[in-house]
Amino acid sequence: MPSNQNRDNFIDKAFTVIAESIVKIMPIEEKEKKAYIYYRDGLAAQNNGDYSEALEYYKESLLLEENKIDRGETLKNMAIIFMSNGEEDLSIETYEKALVENPKQPSCLKNIGLIYEKRGRNAEQNGDLDQRDIWFDKAAEVWTKAVKLYPGGYLDIENWLKNSGRSSIDMYL
């Protein structure tokens, strides 16, 4: 095993031990602790590529979690899995639920835009320029929101918006 991987595994294990210790001593409700444990286990399964297991843990976490920011993060991770599995409509739907819980998640908007932009490129390859423009306009709409939430964080998207003529001057104000 390469030394970088050993170091990363050590860091992951150390973080897990520290996080578990903090969760045990924190003055929070048992329900919240369980929600966090399900979330943590979902994240571990997702990082290991076991997406079905991760989704099950995330669903359990959502049943217990009341904090909107944490719910938004859990939903975002579920949407990432759906996106990875090619379930684009379900991914968009789940990103939108994440944004309802926590509207300040620019990465959700960025990823929705990636799906729209991909659909636009596919339409272009099929010679359907009207459909391409519809999808590109939708991508521009959500990407503009993402850039406003995270200025300078998505330079490639900012460049796409400028180069495609879909950038508005007020986006940077």
Swiss-Prot record:
Cellular compartment(s): Cellular thylakoid membrane
Keyword entries, A-Z: Membrane, Photosynthesis, Repeat, Thylakoid, TPR repeat
Ranges occupied by TPR repeats: 35-68, 72-105, 120-153
Cellular component GO terms held in the UniProt record: plasma membrane-derived thylakoid membrane
PROSITE patterns per UniProt: TPR (PS50005), TPR_REGION (PS50293)
HAMAP family according to UniProt: Ycf3 (MF_00439)
Family designation: Belongs to the Ycf3 family.
Functional note: Essential for the assembly of the photosystem I (PSI) complex. May act as a chaperone-like factor to guide the assembly of the PSI subunits.
Name of the featured protein: Photosystem I assembly protein Ycf3
